[in-house]
Regions:
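Conserved N-terminal beta-strand and adjoining loop/helix that marks the start
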Residues: 1-17, 35, 64
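Active-site-adjacent beta-strand/loop module that shapes the phosphate/pyrophosphate-binding cleft
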Residues: 67-90, 101-107, 116-127
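Conserved Nudix-box catalytic region and its N-terminal flanking loop in Nudix hydrolases
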Residues: 12-52, 56
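Structural detector for helix-capping/boundary residues
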Residues: 34, 48, 61, 103-106
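A short coil-to-beta-strand element that immediately follows conserved catalytic motifs
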Residues: 57-65
Length: 134
């Protein structure tokens, strides 16, 4: 049976990029992500996952990239996203997530052990740098 692709929402705001600490520790810190359901568009899956896991309402703003994840072998779709109604994020699925944080790129790199997908890293460099220069 083919496994469904996974969407990762790269949510940025004036506070930085949203990351989550997983309860199972695999990996300890990650972006908000989940399986794309059959017939679901990646952008709709990103909106659904972020809402379920953080309570945030977001809008997907574009594709960052795709790849087969080097550790899981899963097809990954990375989407840029922005909050539409505030930035207060709370853990919505305590079985899956332990903590949410808005962080800068250096903190995200440190928390994720330098494993951020190159296309995502480049997007965050550009996006967060533009934010910092405003």
């Amino acid at each position: 049976m083919t496994r469904l692709p996974v969407v990762a929402a790269i949510v940025t705001s004036e506070l930085g990029v949203l990351v989550a600490r997983r309860n199972d520790g695999k990996p300890p810190w990650t972006f908000i992500a989940g399986e794309i359901e059959p017939g679901e568009e990646p952008a709709d899956a990103a909106v659904r996952e972020v809402s379920e896991e953080t309570g945030l309402r977001i809008r997907a703003t574009g594709m960052i990239g795709r790849r087969v994840h080097p550790h899981t072998g899963r097809e990954m779709v990375y989407l840029a996203a922005r909050p539409t109604h505030g930035t207060e994020a709370v853990v919505g699925d305590e079985d899956e997530l332990a903590e949410l944080r808005w962080v800068d790129l250096a903190q995200a790199d440190e928390l994720m052990g330098g494993t951020i997908f190159e296309h995502v890293h480049n997007y965050l460099e550009k996006t967060l740098k533009a934010r910092d220069s405003e």
